[in-house]
Amino acid sequence: MALLWLLSVFLLVPGTQGAKDGDMRLVNGASASEGRVEIFYRGRWGTVCDNLWNLLDAHVVCRALGYENATQALSRAAFGPGKGPIMLDEVECTGNESSLANCSSLGWMVSHCGHEKDAGVVCSNDSRGIHILDLSGELPDALGQIFDSQQDCDLFIQVTGQGHGDLSLCAHTLILRTNPEAQALWQVVGSSVIMRVDAECMPVVRDFLRYFYSRRIEVSMSSVKCLHKLASAYGATELQGYCGRLFVTLLPQDPTFHTPLELYEYAQATGDSVLEDLCVQFLAWNFEPLTQAEAWLSVPNALIQALLPKSELAVSSELDLLKAVDQWSTATGASHGDVERLVEQIRFPMMLPQELFELQFNLSLYQGHQALFQRKTMEALEFHTVPLKVLAKYRSLNLTEDVYKPRLYTSSTWSSLLMAGAWSTQSYKYRQFYTYNYGSQSRYSSYQNFQTPQHPSFLFKDKLISWSATYLPTIQSCWNYGFSCTSDELPVLGLTTSSYSDPTIGYENKALILCGGYSVVDVTTFIGSKAPIPGTQETNSSKTPSLFPCASGAFSSFRVVIRPFYLTNSTDTE
């Protein structure tokens, strides 16, 4: 009776003011029954793209607003272009949904069009004669309060933390039965259930159970792994999927790298190959700061073995990579076999002869693996001192192998930093979190002239090639620097050279996309003289978004990396 009384009291509570996610409205029409379609999400209104827009989609809008049906589904900003984000694109409804938010689409704020394609509708003037008082917005909080009260329960839950203390809670089967995600609990036989939970996840169990009532939960960087684990174990598929998508968002938000490392171990333990690949990719792009962090010495051997073969591994130089491996293996007491496998992945030809010579004096690993180092050094010295034509004639070296190609070397020898705009104090502080530096060129410029060697071989040490790198945010800036751009590709990065290039050398140049001045969230390739800049949620462009979202909403800077390699099919080698 107390439960029914509480629910009846809830129905008398006035609704809160303001729109809710999924609410819709019509704007800029000649009457209330027509206009540009706008939908509310995360505190603001935005428009809907007309891709795939049809009468079924329009019916959903009109019926939700109290009209009988839609008479027209209009496209091409028939009621004028809107402002703000484009909330939905490629919407496909059956016509029976309560909101466009419940229809199939590309997802919130993922769009391939601009406001010139805003969707509109014309609804029938006759309303259904129905007036709706909707207080349902208060229901999640009211149900959550029922769980918080821990009274009048008919299901008792004993949560055991595997020797780290138990937790006694209770629930209401009547409410749980309304939520398909709670089946694992309400289908139990009897009035009690035991939940066995990892000790580290005990603090989030109460929030997890409350979610079955309110269908709302706050997920943080510290709780996402446990909530994903609980959702997976108890069949809460919506929560499981939500947490899975959040992993990609949370990876760049921890400058200590504890979260990416924990998620990597979790992915391995659960067999989640997608999450594992994401963790490896993020750590490869941010390898340099990882080696400077306290967490470096706790990186598992399997992860380092997965990182070292990658060409898209961002580090100041190959020598610094080897020194980091030396530090890690010494501190962790890695086995002889593990060290040998790691050293085999080092690209010795990417180190200069002087650096190779000094390894025997400066590297702890050298004496224990002397034969391996000597063999690798001799192979590298051949690469540095023998011209390509002679190597091709007398050696069966496969110069297309990764060992003869550079990684993403971020030192000033091979790269230059471009700013997207004014350098903020906050970004500078973030970059000083670690002692490494991304270069000493003018940090405040969106245009850089710099020089690099033509090739990593010592034969080209004094043969420099000049580059000009530019951040191009507008058509006018493209014209100013001699680039041909379209509005769809802006902003874009430009890279040109005014120097003669050896016909036996090719370039696969890259751009590191930085968020907050310190975290690499994507890497793009220069095709010709331009490299695309990914889209962000804030810009809401038709561009593919960065692999890892930028929490600040805009990219702070870009590191242009020059990557030369031998063209083994060049006629000059014959």
UniProtKB/Swiss-Prot annotation:
The keyword Secreted applies. Disulfide bonds join C49-C113, C62-C123, C93-C103. The keyword Signal applies. It is found in: Secreted; Secreted, Extracellular space, Extracellular matrix. It comes from the Eukaryota. Induction: Up-regulated by virus infection, double-stranded DNA, IFNG and insulin. Down-regulated by hydrocortisone. Detected in thyroid (at protein level). GO terms for biological process: cell adhesion. Glycans are attached at N69, N96, N102, N125, N362, N398, N540, N569. Residues 153-221 form the BTB domain. SUPFAM superfamilies: POZ domain, SRCR-like. Gene3D superfamilies: 1.25.40.420, Potassium Channel Kv1.1, Chain A, SRCR-like domain. One of its GO terms (cellular component) is membrane. It holds the Pfam family SRCR. Promotes integrin-mediated cell adhesion. May stimulate host defense against viruses and tumor cells. Homodimers and homomultimers. The multimers form ring-like structures with a diameter of 30-40 nm. Binds LGALS1 and LGALS3. Binds ITGB1, COL4A1, COL5A1, COL6A1, FN1 and NID. The unglycosylated form interacts with PDE4DIP; this interaction, which is PDE4DIP isoform-specific, may connect a pericentrosomal complex to the gamma-tubulin ring complex (gamma-TuRC) to promote microtubule assembly and acetylation. This is Galectin-3-binding protein. It comes from Rattus norvegicus. The gene is Lgals3bp.
